[in-house]
Each structure stands twice: as structure tokens, then as C-alpha cells.
């Protein structure tokens, strides 16, 4: 099971930028599922978390299947930054301190 740790900045015209930090599990070359995800506000403060089908705090629930990070170049409003697993875990630890129920 190959995993991808990514920061996704989605720009929504007239609204702003949505920031998600995701732990994705590769299904195939085009598709992943979301294992865990964090949502950040524009000040990069963690506002919510998603794990095991559960949302805590302020976060949008992810779709069952999401595009593979390698395909994000096809989406003009999405910027993706790959993270090391350690970087992701540090952010998840910060979220767990804020939301102990995760």
C-alpha cells in the first residue's frame, strides 16, 4: 500500500484558498483514498481533522475516491506540495493535541 503525504492548496475564485494536508493511500495510478486529513485556515492554523470516516472540528469531509497527486497538474486551481511522513506526523500530533478525540 503506497502512501502519499501532500499539502493541497485549492484556490476557489471569489472565496479564497482551502488548505488540506492529506495522508493518501494509492488505489491505482489515477486514484487514492483519504486515510487522514487536516484542514487549515488561511493563517495555517489547524481547524479540523478527518480519520476513519469521521470529521472533527471544522473540515470538509473528503470524497471516497480522490485524484492521485500526480494528476493534480491537470487541475489549474490546485497546487500540491509533497511532504515527508515525519512532517505529516508532526502536524497530526499538533492536531491530536487540539482534538484529542482523533
Give residue spans per PLM region:
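Short, extreme N-terminal segment that most often corresponds to the first beta-strand
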Residues: 1-20
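Short secondary-structure boundary micro-motifs
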Residues: 8-10, 21-23, 57, 64-66
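Acidic, aromatic-enriched beta-alpha/helix-loop junctions
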Residues: 28-74
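Broad, structure-driven detector of short, well-ordered beta-strand segments within folded domains
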Residues: 17-28, 38
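Generic preference for hydrophobic/aromatic residues in regular secondary structure cores
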Residues: 6, 22-23, 34, 80-82
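Intrinsically disordered, low-complexity segments enriched in small/polar residues
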Residues: 2-3, 48, 70, 86
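Short, compact, well-ordered microdomains
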Residues: 63-102
Amino acid at each position: 500500500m503506497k502512501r502519499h503525504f501532500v499539502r493541497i492548496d485549492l484556490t476557489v475564485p471569489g472565496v479564497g484558498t482551502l488548505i488540506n494536508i492529506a495522508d493518501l493511500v494509492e488505489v491505482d495510478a489515477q486514484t487514492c483514498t483519504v486515510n487522514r486529513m487536516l484542514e487549515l485556515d488561511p493563517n495555517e492554523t489547524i481547524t479540523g481533522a478527518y480519520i476513519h470516516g469521521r470529521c472533527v472540528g471544522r473540515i470538509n469531509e473528503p470524497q471516497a475516491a480522490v485524484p492521485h497527486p500526480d494528476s493534480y497538474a491537470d487541475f489549474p486551481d490546485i497546487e500540491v506540495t509533497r511532504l515527508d511522513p515525519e512532517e505529516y506526523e508532526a502536524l497530526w500530533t499538533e492536531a491530536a493535541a487540539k482534538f484529542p478525540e482523533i
